[in-house]
Amino acid sequence: MEEREGGFRKETVERLLRLHFRDGRTRVNGDALLLMAELLKVFVREAAARAARQAQAEDLEKVDIEHVEKVLPQLLLDFV
């Protein structure tokens, strides 16, 4: 199976960041956007991997949202 390289577009990351800016004049450096995009990509991949392991631990072949919800608290703590 060929692995497809994916990620978040800079525009998407900037919009996500702007949702939490208090000052509308706040600017984000292009390098910071690339770094945040990479962090989001790693976070999503790790969430998917942990959810898959959780499903396997429950002897299930399909990952469901409940598996993501079970691993999310520890995942967030690991990324802080």
From Swiss-Prot:
What are the alphabetically sorted keywords of the record?
A: Cell cycle, Cell division, Centromere, Chromosome, DNA damage, DNA repair, DNA-binding, Kinetochore, Mitosis, Nucleus
Give the record's GO biological process terms: cell division; DNA repair; kinetochore assembly; replication fork processing; resolution of meiotic recombination intermediates
Q: What Gene3D superfamilies does this protein's entry cite?
A: 1.20.5.4980, 6.10.130.30
Transmembrane stretches in the record are none
What Gene Ontology terms describe where this protein resides (cellular component)? FANCM-MHF complex; Fanconi anaemia nuclear complex; kinetochore
UniProt superkingdom = Eukaryota
A GO molecular function assigned to this protein is: protein heterodimerization activity
User: Where in the cell?
Assistant: Nucleus; Chromosome, Centromere; Chromosome, Centromere, Kinetochore
Pfam families attached to this UniProt entry: CENP-X
The answer to keyword Transcription applying to this record is: no
Subcellular location, principal: nucleus
Q: How does it assemble?
A: Heterodimer with CENPX, sometimes called MHF; this interaction stabilizes both partners. MHF heterodimers can assemble to form tetrameric structures. MHF also coassemble with CENPT-CENPW heterodimers at centromeres to form the tetrameric CENP-T-W-S-X complex. Forms a discrete complex with FANCM and CENPX, called FANCM-MHF; this interaction, probably mediated by direct binding between CENPS and FANCM, leads to synergistic activation of double-stranded DNA binding and strongly stimulates FANCM-mediated DNA remodeling.
User: Tell me, what does this protein do in biology?
Assistant: DNA-binding component of the Fanconi anemia (FA) core complex. Required for the normal activation of the FA pathway, leading to monoubiquitination of the FANCI-FANCD2 complex in response to DNA damage, cellular resistance to DNA cross-linking drugs, and prevention of chromosomal breakage. In complex with CENPS (MHF heterodimer), crucial cofactor for FANCM in both binding and ATP-dependent remodeling of DNA. Stabilizes FANCM. In complex with CENPS and FANCM (but not other FANC proteins), rapidly recruited to blocked forks and promotes gene conversion at blocked replication forks.
Name the protein family: Belongs to the CENP-X/MHF2 family.
Protein name according to UniProt = Centromere protein X
Q: Which organism was this protein described from?
A: Gallus gallus
Q: Which gene encodes it?
A: CENPX
